[in-house]
C-alpha cells in the first residue's frame, strides 16, 4: 500500500513557468535570505520550509533582546577570526560583501532603530526581540515570500532535468514531491541540513559545539535558570 499522498499547498504556491527557490529553515538566515532573494528577483517564487515557528530562536536570543550583530568589529575577516573556527568555516563571497554594517543598515532602513552597547553587541533600541522578528516577518509578507510551517524537507536529489528534487514531509506518511530551480539550506546546527548537503554530494566537516549548556545536579542552582551574568570561567 502506497501511503504517500500528494499535497496541493505547494503546487498552489508555485505558479506555472515561474522559477522556484526553496529555503530550508525559517530562522534568521533563512528568512533574511528569502527576503533578499525576493527583493533582487521579484518574479522568483520563494518558499521557506520550517518545521516549527519561524524565527523562534531569534525571539529568545540575547535574553529576549536579540543580539543583532557586533558593532565594534566591522571588518569581515577580523570578525570571522573571533568565532570558534571562524577563519576556516566562514567562507564564500557572501561573507565578504555582507558584513555587520550591511546588517545594521538593513534593519535601520526597515524601521528598526539599533544601538551599540559598550561591549560591541548591537540590540534594537526597544530592547525587545519582537522588533526584529516583526520587521523580518513584515518584510517577508510584503515581498511575497511564502512561509510554510509544520513541514520538513526529508530528502533532496538532482532530477534528470537538473533541478532539485525535494521530498517534503508534512505529516507522518504524508509527503509532497517538488522540483526547485534553487535550494538554500539555512537550517543552522540541525542535522537535517547536513543530511541534505550530503545527499547532494557535498563533503562535510564533522560539526562540534561552540555554544552549549552545562548540566549541573545541584538543586540550589535551579532558581538561577535563565539568569545571565558576565564572568570569567577557567576550565
What residue spans do the PLM features occupy?
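Beta1/beta-strand and adjacent pyrophosphate-binding region of the FAD-binding site
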Residues: 14-29, 47
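Glycine-rich FAD pyrophosphate-binding loop
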Residues: 22, 38-63
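Hydrophobic anchor at the start of a short beta-strand
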Residues: 44-46, 114, 183, 204
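Conserved N-terminal/central alpha/beta ligand/cofactor-binding core
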Residues: 51, 56-143, 151
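Cofactor-binding loop segments of dinucleotide-utilizing enzymes, especially the Rossmann-like FAD-
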Residues: 26, 51, 209
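A short, basic/flexible loop-to-alpha-helix module at the beginning of a structural domain
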Residues: 3-18, 174
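Predominantly flavin-linked oxidoreductase catalytic cores and closely associated redox partners
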Residues: 130-131, 135-235
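Short glycine/serine/threonine-rich phosphate/pyrophosphate-binding segments
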Residues: 30-33, 187
Amino acid at each position: 500500500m502506497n501511503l504517500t499522498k500528494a499535497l496541493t499547498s505547494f503546487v498552489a504556491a508555485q505558479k506555472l513557468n515561474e522559477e522556484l527557490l526553496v529555503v530550508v529553515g525559517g530562522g534568521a538566515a533563512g528568512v533574511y535570505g528569502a527576503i533578499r532573494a525576493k527583493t533582487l528577483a521579484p518574479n522568483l517564487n520563494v518558499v521557506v520550509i520550517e518545521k516549527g515557528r519561524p524565527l523562534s530562536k531569534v525571539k529568545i536570543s540575547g535574553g529576549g533582546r536579540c543580539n543583532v550583530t557586533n558593532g565594534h568589529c566591522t571588518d569581515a575577516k577580523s570578525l570571522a577570526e573571533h568565532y570558534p573556527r571562524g577563519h576556516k568555516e566562514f567562507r564564500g563571497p557572501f561573507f565578504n560583501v555582507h558584513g555587520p554594517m550591511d546588517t545594521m543598515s538593513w534593519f535601520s532602513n526597515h524601521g528598526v532603530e539599533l544601538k551599540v552597547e559598550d561591549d560591541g553587541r548591537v540590540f534594537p533600541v526597544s530592547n525587545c526581540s519582537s522588533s526584529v522578528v516583526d520587521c523580518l516577518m513584515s518584510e517577508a509578507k510584503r515581498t511575497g515570500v511564502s512561509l510554510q510551517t509544520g513541514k520538513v524537507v526529508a530528502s533532496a536529489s538532482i532530477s534528470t532535468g537538473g533541478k532539485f528534487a525535494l521530498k517534503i514531509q508534512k505529516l507522518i506518511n504524508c509527503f509532497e514531491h517538488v522540483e526547485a530551480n534553487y535550494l538554500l539550506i539555512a537550517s543552522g546546527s540541525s542535522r537535517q541540513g547536513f543530511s541534505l548537503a550530503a545527499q547532494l554530494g557535498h563533503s562535510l566537516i564533522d560539526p562540534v559545539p561552540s555554544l552549549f549548556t552545562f548540566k549541573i545536579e545541584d538543586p540550589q542552582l535551579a532558581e538561577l535558570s535563565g539568569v545571565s551574568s558576565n564572568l570569567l570561567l577557567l576550565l
